[in-house]
Regions:
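Glyoxalase I/VOC metalloenzyme domain signal
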Residues: 1-37, 44, 49-121, 128-224
Length: 224
């Protein structure tokens, strides 16, 4: 099985930081994950990866302290500031994944066995899009939200994919205001609008969306 290119912009991969990428990769394969064939050429980084949902990939990265993997294969555009001002408190929070009807249990098993994610109680909710099941990683600082189609959508063609990235921020409305000044547009409707709990951007390039969730940055503490 190989990953096929698509015409519309999508979330095609994400990476997890590990102490030993090869060891994590081998363990994932032993647990049943499907590996991605090595395609790195001479002088290119070989980053081990497994198949994720749909056509997406999940990479294992163990080089991130001294330099970024992007420093090896990419050069910054000369006219662009390589270190733009950061928005205070903005951090990665999680990923929203769409799954097929009655497929939530399968993905819970996948993420639990290979990455140590655990389901959260239904009463635990973040942001303004509360559907689906939340999974929490072992360090309690990254989340996956699995959403099945509901209503009549359950009977239509169901695509499984990574739908959007969530960013945590201690002040959602202040972050929305700063991002709007940078040209980011947010949804404003009767059902979906920015609040102190969260916000959702309008789709960009046809299909790419981002979500803001109220969350204070905190140190990673492993689950006991």
């Amino acid at each position: 099985r190989t990953v096929q290119p698509v015409e519309r912009p999508i979330l095609s991969a994400f990476a997890v930081r590990v102490g030993d990428a090869d060891a994590a990769f081998q363990r994932a394969k032993e647990l049943g994950a499907w590996e991605i064939p090595v395609r790195a050429r001479a002088m290119e980084l070989n980053i081990p990866a497994i198949h994720g949902v749909g056509e997406s990939l999940i990479y294992f990265v163990d080089r991130y302290d001294e330099f970024s993997i992007y420093d090896v294969d990419f050069h910054a555009t000369p006219t662009v500031d390589p270190h733009p001002p950061a928005i205070e408190g903005l951090h990665f929070f999680g990923i929203v994944q769409y799954v097929g009807p009655d497929r939530t249990a399968d993905w819970v098993e996948f993420y639990s066995q290979i990455f140590g994610f655990k389901p959260l109680p239904d009463a635990v909710r973040f942001g303004i899009m509360p559907k689906g099941l939340l999974l929490e990683n072992a360090y309690r600082n990254f989340y996956l939200q699995l959403i099945e189609p509901d209503g009549i959508a359950r009977f239509g063609p169901a695509e499984e994919d990574l739908q959007r990235i969530g960013f945590g921020t201690p002040d959602v409305l202040a972050t929305v205001a700063l991002l709007e000044k940078r040209g980011i547009e947010f949804l404003t409707s009767e059902k979906v609008h920015s609040s102190d709990r969260g916000a959702l951007t309008k789709s960009s390039l046809g299909s790419v969306m981002f979500e803001l969730v109220h969350d204070d940055p905190r140190p990673a503490v492993a689950r006991k």
